[in-house]
Amino acid sequence: MARLVRLGGLGVFGALGLAACGADTPPYDSSLPLADGVWVGESAPDEEGAFGRSTVTVSGGKITGSQYVTVQANGSMKGEDYGKDSSGEIANRSAYRAAQKAVSAFDVYARDLIEVGVPADVDVVSGATIAHGQFLEAATEALTESQMAAERGRTGPAGGGSESGGPADG
């Protein structure tokens, strides 16, 4: 019976992972060309209002740069203060360490995307599964926008930031 419960739990988490993918973001097809430029994608917000933002640089049709951040509902980025209480103190060291483990995974996800080239091939870092789901959604959106631009025969300007889902302004 315990085995069935564990498998059932995996099914629920798998369904949640699929549901996390944005309905407006088509699946990423790595066989399609990418337009050069800097592309930004955002995930749907989580239950606390935080969302992931992936900035992907494409040059020569290849992913050459990647950054991933999580933006909290108040607009601040999850960083070294994530997991501290409202006074900026570490009230619970264990919770703070867990929060910081998730934050450290952001750079791992971004680096791995450059290495593997496909968001779905970026492995989950233990302790950062919600961030991974948001990363997948945001990176897929950014790369899909690049592919749609390539299909239209245009490129995004290099450098700068952009609105979600488009080339960055230079």
Predicted regions and their residues:
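Bacterial N-terminal signal peptides that target proteins for export
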Residues: M1-G9
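Bacterial signal peptide processing site
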Residues: G22-T25
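C-terminal motif of bacterial Sec signal peptides marking the signal peptidase cleavage site
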Residues: G17-A20
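Active-site- and interface-proximal helix/loop "cap" or "latch" segments in soluble metabolic
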Residues: Y28, P33-D36, P45-R53, T57-G161, ...
